[in-house]
Amino acid sequence: MVGGSRREHNLISKRFLSAVVLCAVIYGIHLQASSAASQGHGSITLDGVLRQLDRADKNFRSLSADVERTKVTVVVNDKSVETGSILVRGDKMLLEMKAPDARTILRTGDNLYIYTPGLKRVEEYNLAQHRSLVDQYLLLGFGTSGKDLQKAYLVTLLGERTLDGKKTAELELTPKSQEARNQISKIQIWLDESTWLPVQQQFNETGSGDYFIIRYSKVVPNPDLGDANFKPHWPKGTEKVKPQG
């Protein structure tokens, strides 16, 4: 029973971490979409990229985009892909994965919901209970300056690379806190140098060698989003659970 309880705890923790990291990724879009336009065609530097993050547009209000998430399990050479869409406004985020399996992740302040239609179940989490880990990942995005990013991560400019036909600047982030490194060893971000919007992000899991990649498309800054877009409405009969993660 103890072993079973531990496995259940690990499963809950992994599901929670996955949702938190997805939140961070989405806010990463917010951060880059808020940045100024291209800094020119000269050779880029780390300081130059960080300055772009320091110039995040204070008028940014909201965002919508399509998302593709690819999970790679190295030991069995397995690759799974899911696609969906996201809405972001302030500390609210709605991520709706549509294929191959429907799943909704809703964040409103300190509340996080994971709704699985196939199970007719919604899991409810309090982000405040995991504030240290959550803050570590959310530093990737919402309202984060280059200086704040450097406080939480060892930031390295890996160079420039053409990705999906776009010239990108590639950053590597290594978490400074041991708690974060226990989950994610490194993060890579590719930024389109013509717009400073993200093209791709990669999260490398600690120990296993597994990783997942997030690609963005159809990014629209400042769509008109109201509170109704972020209300936790679930179909009648949905089971509500609060896992202890």
List each model region and its residues.
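N-terminal secretory signal peptides that target proteins for export/translocation
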Residues: 1-13
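Bacterial N-terminal signal peptides
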Residues: 18-29
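N-terminal leader/targeting segments and the immediate start of mature chains
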Residues: 31-80, 91-92, 234, 241-245
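Gly/Pro-enriched, hydrophobic low-complexity segments
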Residues: 36, 123, 133, 150, ...
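Short, solvent-exposed helix-to-loop capping segments enriched in aromatics
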Residues: 57, 133-150
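Extracytoplasmic
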Residues: 60-64, 81-83, 90, 100, ...
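Short beta-strands and strand-coil junctions in structured, solvent-facing domains, enriched
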Residues: 73-75, 94, 101-104, 114, ...
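An acidic-aromatic
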Residues: 85-137, 208-212
